[in-house]
Amino acid sequence: MSAPNSYDDEELEELLRRKAAQEQKRLEEERKRKAELESQKESILRVILTPEARQRLTNIKLVKPEFAESLENQLIALAQSGRIKVPLTDEELKQILEQISEQNRRDFKIQIRERGWK
């Protein structure tokens, strides 16, 4: 009776190997796709930003990667729709960052009402 068990174990091991190979292939394809998209994005940013503006964006990416990713996508969309002039200078990028900062700034006001006990 040990022969069928070893056969089942061999089948199971082969199935697991195939699944692992498929998963590895899928992950590799996904990594390649992401690298290709990142490469395309970088080439677009090289066209729409001056070197100084690209350096500022790189600095932002080091500190706030999620914000930088969102900003990159917004800049590309603005450039493609013609809403910003190309190439975008560092000063113009600073202005855009200030506008974003103002939009995101939240003023919290605490109101204290005096109520007398009557």
Curated annotation (Swiss-Prot):
PANTHER family: PROGRAMMED CELL DEATH PROTEIN 5. InterPro entries: DNA_bind_arc (IPR022889), PDCD5-like (IPR002836), PDCD5-like_sf (IPR036883). Keywords: DNA-binding. NCBIfam families: PRK04239.1. Pfam families: dsDNA_bind. It comes from the Archaea. It comes from Saccharolobus islandicus (strain M.14.25 / Kamchatka #1). One of its GO terms (molecular function) is DNA binding. This is DNA-binding protein M1425_1752. GO terms for cellular component: cytosol. Belongs to the PDCD5 family. The keyword DNA-binding applies.
